[in-house]
Amino acid sequence: PAVLFMIPIIIGSLLQFFFYGYSLIWLGVSIGMISLFINVQKEAAYVDILSGLYNRQYFNNILLMHSKNGGAADALAGIMLDIDNLKSINDRFGHAEGDEAISIAGRILRAAVGHQGVLCRLGGDEFIILMHINSQKEIGELVDIIKAQVTQFNESGKKPYEIHFSMGYSIYQNEHGSIDDFIKKIDASMYEDKKRRIGAGILPDRRHHC
């Protein structure tokens, strides 16, 4: 964004030098500010306000571009996450605190993922991470980092509740299926993890889980 702001000013300054007497610098400033405003507005359209992460529209655009480009040399992996206890938080502490839990989940994931991938909130209590990988080992390593960040937050005791995620993943390569298949595989993998955690007594068995 800063580059978009500076380019018209630099051009205006150069033109001012050649066309003395014309107020071209301020014209450049005006154009720069308009360009910056338009760019900020475009970026805002792809950001989920509650979590501060990218939204579903941005996620769809990334997958579409990846598909059109024929895929990258390295595979595209997706890790889907679901906040296990959001319904309980809403029921016990109110929806305002439920919104805060979504915001906290976004911060936990941002701290874990860093620049390794793109973070999006799909809606409700579901998030997804997209990342280019060279081996499946990288997925496991990132999952471990996420778990460590979750533990760190929960042990801080900052809230009267804990944040926990069910997670699932899949790897997308163009020749192996469609985008829809990719998303369905991740979703199925995540709910298998949730089912396993319910079976192990880690999660309560809720028929309608949020």
Over which residues does each language-model region extend?
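Catalytic-core segments of nucleotide cyclases and related cyclic-nucleotide turnover enzymes
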Residues: 140-147, 151-158, 164, 171-203, ...
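A structural signal for short, well-ordered beta-strand segments
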Residues: 78, 127, 165-169
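Signal-transducing coiled-coil linker helices
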Residues: 1-50, 57-67, 118
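Short beta-strand-to-loop capping motifs
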Residues: 129-134, 171-173
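Conserved long alpha-helical elements within nucleotide-processing catalytic cores of c-di-GMP signaling
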Residues: 55-77, 87-114, 120-124, 128-129, ...
